Amino acid sequence: MLVSYKWLKELVDIDVTPAALAEKMSTTGIEVEGIEVPAEGLSKLVVGHVLSCEDVPETHLHLCQVDTGDETPRQIVCGAPNVKAGIKVIVAVPGARIADNYKIKKGKIRGMESLGMICSLQELGLSDSIIPKEFSDGIQILPEEAVPGDAIFKYLDLDDHIIELSITPNRADALSMRGVAHEVAAIYGKSVSFPQKNLQESDKATSEAIEVAIASDKVLTYASRVVENVKVKPSPQWLQNLLMNAGIRPINNVVDVTNYVLLYFGQPMHAFDYDKFEDHKIVARAARQGESLVTLDGEKRDLTTEDLVITVADKPVALAGVMGGQATEIDGNSQTVVLEAAVFDGKSIRKTSGRLNLRSESSSRFEKGVNYATVLEALDFAAAMLQELAEGQVLSGHVQAGQLPTEPVEVSTSLDYVNVRLGTELTFADIQRIFDQLGFGLTGDETRFTVAVPRRRWDISIPADLVEEIARIYGYDKLPTTLPEAGGTAAELTPTQALRRKVRGLAEGLGLTEIISYALTTPEKAIEFAVAPSHLTELMWPMSVERSALRQNMVSGMLDTVAYNVARKQSNLALYEIGKIFEQEVNPKEDLPNEVNHFAFAICGLVAQKDFQTQAQAVDFYHAKGILDTLFANLNLKVQYVPTKDLANMHPGRTALILLDEQVIGFVGQVHPGTAKAYSIPETYVAELDMAALEAALPSDQTFAEITKFPAMTRDIALLLDREVSHQAIVTAIESAGVKRLTSIKLFDVYEGATIQAGKKSMAYSLTFQNPNDNLTDEEVAKYMEKITKSLTEQVGAEVR
């Protein structure tokens, strides 16, 4: 919200600087983003009166003699198409500073001396989007009353201070000058002064010219007035200045009046050309599937049943609350104007403007809410302005469909309730004074009082809201600092928090870097790497399809991060994330999904760089598995790795499921080359674990085992096996022999070659045995080896080499 300091001072009698006002507002609940002075950086810009204007042959230039208040006219060469004799213009004299700190100097153009520059508003730093179209390609023409030689700032209100407010959704009342005036008046203990318009109505009734009806419960009220015999023309300079300072382009006096009322009351309005109506009945209803509308910006909008439209003769003429239609827009030939003031459902307007990517000053106010109590007042004010600025004749009365509650909302509380929550010792007189400043009614006493909250403050409905208002106006800086009286208790991590912290520490100790990716993704990516996909949980109204579904895996988000970094020449990556996935086993439209904590990581590129001693080493499956092995070892958990080809987006020969107590808790492996290509990433290895399953399996107590004094004994065994036999199957077979003294199984060689028959491979293991209480003998170890050999032969068909 852009607030004109000049305009604000007309509504509230304050004598503070804009900077002091901004600081005060920021400390009482409405944040000020900044203050801008349009004239800042500009100098030596004066009013000029063009005395003569001659075309320069064979050029687009004009040789002008301009009166700038000096003794003699100033010769200026100007290329603007709309320069002519008799007009008042903006002149930058030599030494002047215009936009971008550009300094104007005397010069020659086509051999002709030019003693200054006739300026457009763009050259003063104003945006093209707010400059009247009649001046967008040429110079600005000043009012007739401008005096040659005067500084131009007061004529264009460039010396105003524009205060930019950051309005939160709960304070939509401040999206109007009247709302801001009420706020400032409350802060400084002043009274507001709102100008009144004298509306003179003709004998003809509005109901004779127009009829309105509502055919949707999303239209709360719809009111109209009719103004005849209007003269459409440019608005007076003061109104154009006011709109431009608020970031709105002046169009003509009729449209500008509706925008003025929007800024003043916060009530969106629209003006229709009555003579372009095919019928005299306006109906506000939901759009029908297949209907379309060409809006004021010239775009054809395809409508859905979720949109609200204003119709005449059952044809849409406006997109309710968002933008009018081109077919009934006001133009230079318009003579009879229909003014609309309505209240539409904010959620419906938000959906429509979001779907069409068509946000306007009107839609933003309907989305946040408008003041029910001033809808008709704003309508009458607009009609009176058209009577004043467009010489229109206002038909008597208005037509309206749908009624709104306009009486104040009553909220009750007590003085004790207020003081307990603020830690203050306010008296009832203090409370009365504060609510008087706010313009709220107050009845009762300190035991129980009732506040009559005006409809303009629809954010206040419960006692806690009253406490907040009291604190704001009393001053947050005046609230006493109180310390809690209860004794403190030592904080303790929950098991989930403790596991999360431990896993994070282990991951970072292994060289992984934490990331945080979006929980929302595309429906396809949401289930891309899920071991057991469930029903999708999708947003009903997503901002974009890329963020429309809750993820059921974390790997897809990690790969997006990998792709982002690889595209920026960062190819050696080791990333991890701890976050939630969302599983939905029932109806996603009726039930909330289960939120499950998961741990995932992704590695790609080199694990070791090339140097003078070693060759570069790329990451592989065993690096990924090694990270998991370290994690499980530190958590004192024993898992199994089972090869799988069931995960479509993982490499079928380099992927394994991770089993804990015979339950799948995750997977590890290489991303399928096709998937990696789709993500534009190199060979990448990933893993994902169910943290909830890890937490459930953690041993409650860990018993310390004394370090044995007795030495271990090691035996190597080389096995000839079928090529399909996995390492995990061999480990399982060795462990199933039931040798209690076996403490370690390590694979140290795998061989396939000419000396091995086709379809076979050789795998060599180092087995370590140890008795914590005694020395092992060779005979004991030999028996252990016999049992292990027998188990290997029976279970995996191994031959000892």
UniProtKB/Swiss-Prot annotation:
> Which compartments is it annotated to reside in?
Cytoplasm
Check the record and name the InterPro entries matching this protein: aa-tRNA-synth_II/BPL/LPL, B3/B4_tRNA-bd, DNA-bd_dom_put_sf, Fdx_antiC-bd, Fdx_antiC-bd_sf, NA-bd_OB-fold, Phe-tRNA-ligase_IIc_bsu, Phe-tRNA-ligase_IIc_bsu_bact
What Gene Ontology molecular function terms does this protein carry?
A: ATP binding; catalytic activity, acting on a protein; magnesium ion binding; phenylalanine-tRNA ligase activity; transferase activity; tRNA binding
Query: What does the entry give for GO biological process?
Result: phenylalanyl-tRNA aminoacylation
Catalytic activity, as annotated: tRNA(Phe) + L-phenylalanine + ATP = L-phenylalanyl-tRNA(Phe) + AMP + diphosphate + H(+)
Where the record annotates domain B5, the positions are: 406-481
What's the Enzyme Commission number for this chain?
Answer: 6.1.1.20
Please give the superkingdom of this protein's source.
Bacteria
The record describes how the cofactor is bound as: Binds 2 magnesium ions per tetramer.
Looking at the record, the residues that make up the tRNA-binding domain are 39-153
Q: What keyword terms does UniProt attach to this protein?
A: Aminoacyl-tRNA synthetase, ATP-binding, Cytoplasm, Ligase, Magnesium, Metal-binding, Nucleotide-binding, Protein biosynthesis, RNA-binding, tRNA-binding
A GO cellular-component term linked to this record: phenylalanine-tRNA ligase complex
Q: What class of enzyme is it?
A: ligase
Amino acids binding Mg(2+): 459, 465, 468-469
The record places domain FDX-ACB at 708-801
Signal peptide range in chain numbering = none
- Cofactor entry: Mg(2+)
Checking PANTHER family in the record gives: PHENYLALANINE--TRNA LIGASE BETA SUBUNIT (PTHR10947:SF0), PHENYLALANYL-TRNA SYNTHETASE BETA CHAIN AND LEUCINE-RICH REPEAT-CONTAINING PROTEIN 47 (PTHR10947)
What family, per the record? Belongs to the phenylalanyl-tRNA synthetase beta subunit family. Type 1 subfamily.
- Name listed for the protein in its UniProt record: Phenylalanine--tRNA ligase beta subunit
